[in-house]
Design a protein with these regions (language model features):
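Beta-propeller fold detector
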Residues: 80-81, 120-128, 179-190, 250-259, ...
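Beta-propeller blade signature
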Residues: 168-176, 227-243, 309-310
């Protein structure tokens, strides 16, 4: 997750292949409303031009000849409050059941429901008795509904148990549509944690129907346990599990996982692993139109990074990649005094340095809604420390450029996406906002 003590007042240079031009902030978000009914904030900014492609290449705008091109510079973004009074919310998602409900994960161990703009008083799930949330990166951290949730009632959570270890469990909705059976817990996977931070926590079903799990490197500083590049640990990885083919088993290994039979640099790899070399992939998502995978991987002392895996045939992403940690932090050798080889590594599509703009990336989603046409196809992400929100879009020459959309002033713990493709900002301080 993110630091407990937010470090504000440091500006990142949004790097697209190489270091770009610094962004400018011109407005901030007003405080959240005091009641859960929808209310428009006063958060609006004037868009500004951003990132060049290299020190010698001027920024190039993509032609705006078609409305299908994302055009963040024309967007006047605001945040509409949809819920307040939450207890340290860290995620929001829909169930894919057509109900229009939004499910909000609270760090302490509860899941709340937003239904028709109203925050229901009774939690959908309450497992506070099983969750350790004392540490800043501990708690109930992730939620994913099974693709067949409407039929099976199954959903999956990622939490830190009372012993300080990661647990991924399946639960089932109860007789009421707005409550789950806390006694239905079926443990899918447990991972021992050597420290209290870098716990990952994101769960998401991919277009292939498999459950993807993001794990941190085990914590402390600089990967002292050497987990990022260790193929014999599940820490510092992206996992891919089949949890739906046989619901009587915790999971099975998809036969197409990259290291079921193959080795990595001559070493055997745990078959659950889909990709290696991640530090703390706190939030990742799949583009619901293309199937592309986007990862916001929280950096160490200097760089925050965005990784993208373009989907291939059938809208599926390639496994077997190494995102570099702790050989590299972002696009740079780690530590910065070291020399390293990039051979065999998948580098980020964008990075930014720690500074006034932030210190801890919060990965988001490619916008596929209808309320903000200028953002369709843009990857929306933010920073927990600064509260800034950006749009990342393709630029000339296969590079990427970032556009500052808003300086929200919020502790952005997550973004959320509803069934219509509209996006939400989750504020750890206790509120959820809709991008509008």
């Amino acid at each position: 997750m993110h630091p407990a003590n937010r470090r504000r007042g440091r500006a990142p240079l949004l790097t697209v292949v190489v270091l770009p031009i610094c962004l400018v902030v011109v407005a901030a978000c007003a405080p959240a409303a005091s009641q859960p009914s929808p209310a428009t904030t006063q958060a609006q900014v004037r868009p500004v031009a951003t990132s060049g492609l290299s020190p010698t290449t001027a920024p190039t705008r993509r032609p705006q000849s078609t409305p299908l091109e994302p055009d963040p510079a024309q967007v006047r973004l605001r945040l509409d409050s949809v819920a307040t009074g939450l207890d340290r919310p860290v995620f929001a998602t829909d169930a894919g059941d057509g109900s229009g409900r939004l499910f909000v994960v609270e760090k302490g161990g509860t899941i709340r429901i937003l239904d028709g703009g109203r925050l229901l008083a009774r939690p959908f799930l309450d497992i506070r008795d099983r969750v350790l949330s004392r540490g800043s990166e501990q708690g109930l951290l992730g939620l994913a509904f099974a693709p067949d949730f409407q039929r099976s009632g199954y959903f999956y959570v990622d939490y830190i148990d009372r012993s300080g270890n990661t647990v991924i469990s399946r639960f089932q909705a109860g007789k009421s549509a707005n409550s789950a059976d806390s006694g239905s817990e079926f443990k899918v996977l447990g991972i021992d944690q050597p420290a209290s931070n870098h716990n990952g926590g994101m769960l998401a079903f991919g277009p292939d129907g498999y459950l993807y799990v993001g794990t941190g490197d085990g914590g402390r500083e600089g990967d002292p346990f050497h987990n990022g590049q260790n193929p014999q640990t599940l820490l510092g990885k992206l996992l891919r599990l089949d949890v739906t083919t046989d619901p009587t088993k915790p999971y099975t290994i998809p036969p197409s996982n990259p290291w079921v039979t193959a080795k990595y640099n001559g070493q055997a790899v745990l078959p659950e692993i889909w990709a290696i070399g991640l530090r703390n992939p706190w939030r990742f998502s799949f583009d619901r139109k293309t199937g592309d995978l986007w990862i916001g991987d929280v950096g160490q002392n200097t760089y925050e990074e965005i990784d993208r895996i373009a989907a291939g045939a059938g809208g599926r992403v390639q496994g077997g990649l190494n995102f570099g940690w702790s050989i590299m932090e972002g696009m740079h050798c780690y530590p910065d005094t070291a020399t390293c080889s990039r051979a065999g590594l998948t580098l980020p599509v964008a990075e930014y340095t720690h500074g006034a703009d932030g210190c801890s990336i919060t990965g988001g989603y490619v916008y596929r809604g209808t309320a903000i046409p200028g953002l369709v196809g843009a990857y929306i992400y933010g920073d927990y420390c600064s509260g800034r929100i950006w749009a990342l879009t393709p630029a000339a020459g296969g590079a990427w450029q970032s556009q500052l959309l808003l300086d929200s002033g919020l502790a952005i713990s997550s973004f959320g996406q509803d069934q219509a493709g509209e996006l939400y900002v989750v504020d750890l301080g206790g509120a959820v906002y809709r991008l509008a």
